[in-house]
UniProtKB/Swiss-Prot annotation:
The gene is UQCRHL. The keyword Isomerase does not apply. It is found in: Mitochondrion inner membrane. Residues 1-13 form a transit peptide. GO terms for biological process: mitochondrial electron transport, ubiquinol to cytochrome c. Pfam families: UCR_hinge. It comes from Homo sapiens (Human). May be a component of the ubiquinol-cytochrome c reductase complex (complex III or cytochrome b-c1 complex), which is part of the mitochondrial respiratory chain. This protein may mediate formation of the complex between cytochromes c and c1. Disulfide bonds join C37-C81. GO terms for cellular component: mitochondrial inner membrane; mitochondrion; respiratory chain complex III. This is Cytochrome b-c1 complex subunit 6-like, mitochondrial. It comes from the Eukaryota.
Length: 91
């Protein structure tokens, strides 16, 4: 193999940086579906209840209350929506 052959192989193989630019940026479908589900009325209401209760609990200096129930309600509403939509988006 001569010097010319080596140079030809280097130019034909392409630059790895160019190949990376040509590839599409992959987007996680789970993230996309979660964002869509958070916009639904049921999730919006659950988030509003969570934020309202969080403000209530945070305003008190000494309290044993927490927002666990409201957090679980919000996550349940969002996950319920995601479960129905996610697999339709997979290839």
């Amino acid at each position: 193999m001569g010097l010319e052959d080596e140079q030809k192989m280097l130019t034909e193989s392409g630059d790895p940086e160019e190949e990376e630019e040509e590839e599409e940026e992959l987007v996680d479908p789970l993230t996309t579906v979660r964002e869509q589900c958070e916009q639904l009325e049921k999730c919006v209401k659950a988030r509003e209840r969570l934020e309202l209760y969080d403000e209530h609990v945070s305003s008190r200096s000494h309290t044993e209350e927490d927002c666990t129930e409201e957090l679980f309600d919000f996550l349940h509403a969002k996950d319920h929506c995601v479960a129905h939509k996610l697999f339709n988006n997979l290839k």
